[in-house]
């Protein structure tokens, strides 16, 4: 066989293989329509779980999207009436809308702020030190959204040194 014939046969096989591969490749899915992406959840259908049964007994969370333990999320959080958290920080910023109850936050060294239903707060992450509590008259429910996983780092207070 001449070199030109071998070249033509090889080229024909390559083209034929490419055509067969195109026909057998799975078709790309069309993007979902807006109606197919719609999510609606009744309040009674929320899946409330314990946020941290050991460190925050009674505090519940219901993820709406994402996963609060792994990364970006949107969720409802419920604090029991009278619940309080000592001085602490969070790694990530949180945007919060209060749904019910009276939420109380005291930035370190400043007076407490009481926020009721309909109030909004953008709480910075990083070194923003504050206490958090819920008024004892009723549970506090709020919506929180963050670009990172939820965490709570209690600030260790310096203990006085005792002289021997």
Identify the function of each model-found stretch:
Residues 69, 108-127:
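Short acidic-glycine-tyrosine-enriched beta hairpin
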Residues 125-150:
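Ligand-binding loop in jelly-roll beta-barrel domains
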């Amino acid at each position: 066989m001449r070199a030109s014939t071998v070249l033509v046969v090889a080229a024909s096989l390559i083209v034929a293989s490419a055509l067969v591969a195109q026909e057998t490749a799975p078709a790309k899915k069309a993007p979902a329509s807006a109606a197919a992406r719609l999510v609606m959840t009744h309040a009674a259908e929320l899946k409330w779980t314990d946020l941290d049964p050991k460190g925050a007994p009674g505090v519940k969370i219901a993820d709406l999207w994402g996963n609060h333990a792994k990364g970006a999320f949107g969720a409802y959080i419920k604090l029991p009436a009278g619940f309080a958290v000592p001085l602490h920080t969070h790694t990530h910023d949180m945007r919060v809308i209060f749904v019910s109850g009276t939420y109380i936050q005291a930035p370190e060294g400043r007076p407490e702020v009481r926020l009721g239903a309909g109030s909004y707060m953008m709480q910075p992450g990083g070194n923003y030190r504050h206490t958090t509590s819920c008024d004892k008259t009723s549970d506090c429910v709020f919506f929180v959204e963050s670009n990172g996983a939820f965490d709570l780092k209690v600030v260790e207070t310096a203990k006085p040194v005792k002289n021997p």
